[in-house]
A protein has these predicted regions:
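Short alpha-helical DNA-recognition segment
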Residues: 25-44
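A short, Lys/Arg-rich alpha-helix, primarily the initiator
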Residues: 1-23
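Short, charged recognition helix plus adjacent turn
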Residues: 2, 7, 70-87
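Residues in the recognition helix of alpha-helical DNA-binding motifs
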Residues: 20, 34-35, 45, 74
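DNA major-groove recognition helix of helix-turn-helix/homeodomain DNA-binding modules
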Residues: 53-71
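Residues that mark the N-terminal boundary/hinge immediately upstream of a DNA-recognition element
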Residues: 16, 27, 53-56
Length: 87
């Protein structure tokens, strides 16, 4: 079950991260700077190759995400749908 949560978070975070970067018209380097990470690590997040750390998630929610409540609601809904399918 924990793997399901990790997979869902990875996919949802990747999508929202990309969306917010495009919305803000930022390069990967600019987004990496906002999230206090190197460009290579950011690129892995932006392409969905890796999942975010707790610190990166918090920095994203505090400094980048336009609608935190909406993102968290979408994430909760995805978790609920994903765990129902896994059961």
């Amino acid at each position: 079950m924990r793997r399901t949560y990790h997979t869902i978070l990875k996919e949802r975070f990747h999508r929202r991260l990309w969306y917010e970067r495009i919305r803000l018209d930022w390069t990967q380097a600019e987004m990496a700077e906002q999230l206090h990470m190197d460009e290579r690590s950011y690129s892995d997040l932006d392409t969905g190759k890796s999942c975010c750390s707790a610190v990166t998630l918090v920095l994203f929610l505090v400094y980048v995400c336009e609608d935190v409540a909406l993102f968290l609601e979408e994430l909760r809904n995805a978790f609920e749908a994903g765990t129902e399918n896994a059961a």
